[in-house]
Design a protein with these regions (language model features):
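Extended hydrophobic secondary-structure segments
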Residues: 267, 275-276
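N-terminal topogenic membrane-targeting module
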Residues: 1-86, 93
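Long, mid-chain structured domain cores
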Residues: 50, 59, 66-131, 136-138
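Short inter-helical turns and helix N-cap capping residues of alpha-solenoid HEAT/ARM repeat scaffolds
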Residues: 87-88, 117-121, 148-152, 178-180, ...
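Structural detector for internal amphipathic alpha-helices that build alpha-solenoid repeat scaffolds
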Residues: 62-71, 93-102, 124-135, 153-165, ...
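Membrane-interacting alpha-helical segments
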Residues: 49-61, 244, 274-275, 302-306
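Amphipathic alpha-helical scaffolding segments comprising HEAT/armadillo-like alpha-solenoid repeats
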Residues: 35-39, 71-84, 104-116, 137-147, ...
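Alpha-helical oligomerization segments
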Residues: 293-295, 300-308, 315
């Protein structure tokens, strides 16, 4: 009971000191007064971590969030360095998470050293990499482009999502080939960004001899819902790969250009269900899409096309009737 009371008293003391510094511009770092509570007491460090993490999640004000980082750097840097070098596995992992959350760039050299010396590939190694990415470590970013290590696409995506956007665009511009996991991940994250500055890249990669790259380029154009070189799309309607035909149909549905209607009509009779589905959905979103689908349902020579058109016209009727 006494131990719990002491812990709650410490929690109150820590929270009060943190909030006073964060929300009072007249209080300097030297006036926070936490140093004497931290000496040799790991519980106080843990309470400080919890307090800073809570405020960081609750606060949107950029200057106040920066003060959270200042507090973390001032009070936790040496403690974290000691945990990284001497702590048990669970402590090291938690420390890496907190360093990432608090963006403690002063510890980047220590973590880079761990990256170089940690030979075993495990969860800790991957978190070291994620933390370096969150700290915007240019040594890691340079290595990705120059060496393209054989890491998973998933890990690469986690790295690129942590990059500053300008740094990400720079790395994209520096990559010679997108045919490896690092390139695949870059294109996936570029699509997530929906940044129109990357549209020329997607358009250029439509001519790649790699199916994986072409698919990612098509998905990027689909996400942006625009293209400047419309002539580049048409050939994908007759691709031997069904996924490219499907993506053509979906993009055509976003662009809604009349030049694609006859092609979509043909794709309604495609041998692949996903392509037929994509073509029907695309036509459905054209201005006269329902009329076009009704015509296909009545006149298309392919029974699969007629059936798909019937389903989409029926879905319109179902919505109009309130689903009854």
């Amino acid at each position: 009971m006494r131990k719990q009371k002491r812990k709650e008293h410490l929690r109150f003391t820590v929270d009060k000191a943190v909030s006073t510094y964060l929300f009072n511009d007249s209080i300097s770092l030297n006036e926070v007064g936490l140093t004497r509570h931290l000496k040799g007491q790991s519980i106080t460090y843990e309470l400080l971590e919890e307090s800073l993490e809570t405020y960081q999640k609750l606060i949107d004000h950029e200057e106040t969030r920066e003060k959270v980082v200042v507090l973390a750097e001032h009070y936790l840097r040496d403690y974290y360095k000691d945990q990284l070098l001497k702590g048990r596995w669970s402590k090291r992992m938690n420390t890496l998470y907190y360093i990432e959350d608090f963006k403690m760039r002063s510890l980047a050299d220590t973590i880079w050293m761990l990256f170089q010396t940690h030979s075993k590939w495990d969860e800790e190694k991957e978190q070291i990499i994620r933390t370096l990415a969150a700290l915007q470590d240019v040594r890691l970013f340079g290595m990705l482009v120059e060496e393209q290590p054989d890491w998973s696409v998933g890990l690469y995506k986690e790295i690129f999502r942590r990059m500053d956007r300008d740094q990400f665009k720079y790395n994209v511009s520096e990559l010679d080939s997108f045919e490896h996991p690092v390139g695949h991940a870059m294109l996936d994250v570029a699509r997530e960004e929906r940044d129109e500055d990357l549209l020329p890249l997607f358009e250029d990669l439509l001519s790649s001899h790699s199916l994986e790259v072409r698919i990612r380029a098509l998905k990027g154009i689909l996400a942006l819902e625009r293209i400047t070189k419309v002539e580049l799309l048409t050939s994908f309607a007759s691709s031997s790969e069904w996924v490219e035909r499907m993506l053509f149909a979906r993009i055509a549905g976003k662009l809604k250009q009349s030049r694609y209607i006859s092609i979509l009509n043909e794709l309604m009779g495609d041998s692949n269900w996903w392509v037929r589905q994509g073509a029907a959905e695309a036509l459905f979103h054209y201005r006269d899409g329902v009329l076009i689908l009704e015509h296909i349902h009545t006149n298309h020579p392919d029974p699969f096309a007629r059936d798909m058109a019937r389903q989409w016209v029926g879905s319109r009727d179902s919505v109009s009737d309130g689903g009854c």
